[in-house]
């Protein structure tokens, strides 16, 4: 399962200007004139109605694997910085150290124990910040990844797919 919170920068300049305008209108007690988002976005989270391309792209990368992915896209009221929360279920349990070592070895990834936010870590950053969350067991089969990145600087959806590929390949093969 994957939950992705998109910044308004995904809409380009019109998205960032629209959120700034919504905030200004609401802070000054004026009514909203929404033209970009399907609903008020300032101080709100809006579910995306269209299908994500992430699940089909993951299936294309691993045609021999049966990938059951549920993707939920939410439009977040932040200007920059994408947040992705991915729940990973492995076919077989692995030692926690093996998974941690694999995550540390990923290209352009910084594994972090600190609080990750799209404002601090997803704006004007070219790295992909990742937090590994799991039970305290020695061997784990399920874990959560909390990922924060600036898609404008680090690339588009391909980075998420590339990350998934690097994570899944060593585990599945």
Where are these regions (language model features)?
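Active-site-lining helix/loop region of Rossmann-like oxidoreductase modules
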Residues: 1-101
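C-terminal active-site/capping subdomain that shapes the small-molecule cofactor and substrate pocket
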Residues: 68-173
């Amino acid at each position: 399962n994957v939950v992705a919170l998109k910044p308004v920068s995904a809409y380009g300049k019109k998205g960032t200007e629209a959120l700034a305008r919504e905030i200004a209108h609401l802070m000054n007690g004026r009514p909203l004139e929404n033209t970009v988002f399907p609903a008020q976005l300032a101080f709100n989270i809006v579910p995306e109605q269209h299908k994500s391309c992430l699940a089909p792209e993951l299936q294309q990368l691993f045609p021999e694997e049966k990938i059951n992915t549920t993707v939920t896209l939410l439009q977040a009221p932040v200007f920059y910085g994408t947040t992705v929360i991915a729940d990973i279920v492995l076919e077989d349990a692995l030692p926690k150290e093996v998974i941690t070592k694999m995550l540390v070895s990923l290209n352009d990834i910084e594994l972090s124990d600190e609080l990750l936010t799209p404002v601090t870590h997803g704006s004007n950053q070219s790295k992909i910040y990742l937090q590994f969350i799991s039970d305290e067991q020695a061997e784990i089969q399920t874990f959560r990844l909390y990922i924060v990145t600036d898609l404008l600087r680090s690339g588009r959806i391909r980075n998420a797919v590339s990350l998934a590929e690097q994570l899944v390949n060593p585990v599945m093969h």
